[in-house]
Amino acid sequence: MATKDKELTPMQRQYNEIKEKNQDCILFFRLGDFYEMFNDDARTAAKELDLTLTTRDRGKPKEEQTPMCGVPYHSVDSYIARLVQKGYKVAICEQMTDPATTKGLVERDITRIVTPGTVTESCMLDESKNNYMACLYGMGGKFGLAFCDVSTGAFFVTVCSDAQSVASELGRFAPSEVLRFGAGVEEETISDALFRRLGCCVDEGHEQQFRLEAAEELLERHFEQNLAQLGIAGMDTAVIASGALLQVLLDVQKNDLKHIRQLQYYTNGKFMELDMDARRNLELTETMRAKEKKGSLLWVLDKTHTAMGGRMLRSWMEKPLLDVAEISRRHGAVEDLVENPIVRGELTEALKDVSDLERVMTRIVTGTVNCRDLLGLARGFRALPEVKTQLQNCESPLLHKLEAAIDPLTDCADLIENTIVDDPPLTVREGGIIRKGANADADRLRDIMDGGKDIIASIEASEKEKTGIRTLKVSFNRVFGYYIEVSKSFMDQVPGHYIRKQTLANCERYITQELKELEEQVLTAKDRLTALEYQIFTQLREHLARQAARVQLTASAVASADVLCSLASVAVQRGYCRPEITLGREIHIENGRHPVVEAVLKDTLFVPNDTNLGSDDNQVAIITGPNMAGKSTYMRQVALIVLMAQMGSFVPARSAKIGLVDRVFTRIGASDDLASGQSTFMVEMAEVASILKYATSRSLLILDEIGRGTSTYDGMAIARAVLEYAASPKRLGAKTLFATHYHELSTMEQRLPNVKNYNIAVKKRGDQMIFLRKIVPGATDDSYGIEVAKLAGIPNTVISRAREILEELEAEGGRVQMVAEVAADDQVSMMDLTGQQVIAALEAITVETLTPIEAMNELYKLKKMLQ
């Protein structure tokens, strides 16, 4: 503070002490009915929240005045939410003692710290998304990566062997906040994911937070299991990351977080891997440009009716399975619901009444729940028996398993409804929340408040009868409280236990012990009732908190049922089929459709297409055709169908047989990375390099216009080299859809046995070009570029001139011809193809056995190659 320390008030010193311990937070300091902010916190809050900045100590010189601003306590959550959304941390400092009964300085302390990754308030969260905080720890070339959504209790940890895997996992969970420390955590790939791709809040950790012994002790104490039981024994990076994250959450929440009851270790081998480019290009959860849910795959598939189901659907989409049996169980459950429309309809109606069990339970455990939340929870519990009944009517083993996992929680619903009034106030400390009949002491206090006048009248009548004083009255004033008034004419009849308090001209005023006790009861009944109701509420809250495990298991089962019901509803509505998942390598799709494009088309039918990929003679599909014809849509369609199938969904096709795919890679579109100063071509090459490094023979590659960011010859050479590498069984042999404008690459079908040409059919009618949107075998030698330019609205004079130039180029033979032979498998490279061929030829020559004439012939061949 600007004020000298010796001149500070006790409250100001108290503020300084608390602020000193929370320097990275904006401190909301409770003063009566307001939360006040001071100094730099006030300046920041005033700017970000559009608050009026004022000062304390206005009588002092300006340089000694303290900037301040404040917000009302009853609307504080909305202000906190705005700051957290902007990336700030907020520390909430509450009054721990009642100012009305406290002599001297009110005790204050931090009750919680709100950060982007630790929010639990419903008004600050998207109910359909998890809100993860992550912890990244690097050591010895490995990375421990832990994720926790404190609002639901979900806690995951994994170990990554390289920065690319870290980036992929960060993309999968999309945390709001990341704590990082250790070797390699600032690698470019990771930092790019954190800052540019995710834009999340990054906290730089310090060594004291990442100690193995402390992490082991904390994890074993919290989860009441040893590391072997937790599944992370010997995995030091995972242990340290998990322990550091849990400690941060405990420090921030000021709570034991008993709803975080399971640490789930997972390996990358359990789920299909999707890097951040694939997630973006396939528009799984949001569109690339508008960043909106509408227009994404999630938008099409999300017919869930519970908040938990919405979050789980997103999770299934982010984590397609690699276990054929588990995938099949999901498909079986969806099929069961597809074939039973009555059950599906009744289940849907029951799910609509289920509240967000996970997040309400978290607010119960963390002490931030209110009575309205509890009544909503009870209504959700009341819907559970019907959910169980409908699942019992199904035949799917998975649906039966979910039914068995659902606890109807009738006892909890009864307790809540028998305790809380039907329409409670929003706050829990102001009374009026406990139902009549729930507690005898509360009822008695309520009777005292409601029947005070009746009690007084009863005492007055009783005293008249006992004393025989007809004029006796019981009255009240602020000086004496309740008193008995007796006229002078009856003074000799006043009982000895009456205590005289006042003498007036015509009467005397007395008090009795009974009246003083009544006064104490009546005057303090409201305050005592309010305190008692809060005590009853906290007892109810603590009882419910002990049911966290029951509620969470039920919530997970309900969420899964909701997702399966959603997928079934979409399958019926859109005419999807059950895919067959195999351990083979082939993808066979009959009449496949793009799920999103089909959904947005209103007056036009989507043109379906077949896909046959992965066989010995059809490993790589080269797709040619004009811009706007639908190449990119088709390739994305195939990738989305594969992903949908492996997440457990039916797919938009007449039939589909899909060999398990471990990774989907995409190289689609072109854009400069201005933030890092990289050109379009550099971005493209970096993505291609990553694909070729991490893809396997089980991967699906979607490659669109490789090489177009550079000159024609360089681009064509690179495109061909990448194609050869992907097709080569010795190098990669991955299933590949390869769209290109380099029509010369169509000759690869004759050179490589597992490459096939396809094109997008186009029909010309006079000067008009009609896109048929149909994939047909064979290559096309015409890009229809000028026709597309005409459709785009290029002026006719420019179009005419372009036709003249094209005729001149074609007459001069200006089209590039690719005449080089296919390089040997061990020669495929991204370098210049001619140079590579010369090197390969030289390496193949055995100089010791070469005759002079053979040497001359070889030299002639090399010279011809260079020409």
Q: What is the role of each PLM region?
A:
Residues 39, 235, 305-306, 310, ...:
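ATPase nucleotide-binding head domains, primarily ABC-like/P-loop NTPase cores
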Residues 93, 116-125, 256, 392-398, ...:
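Active-site phosphate-binding and catalytic loops of NTP-dependent enzymes
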Residues 210-220, 272-276, 288, 379-458, ...:
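Amphipathic heptad-repeat alpha-helical coiled-coil/stalk segments that mediate oligomerization
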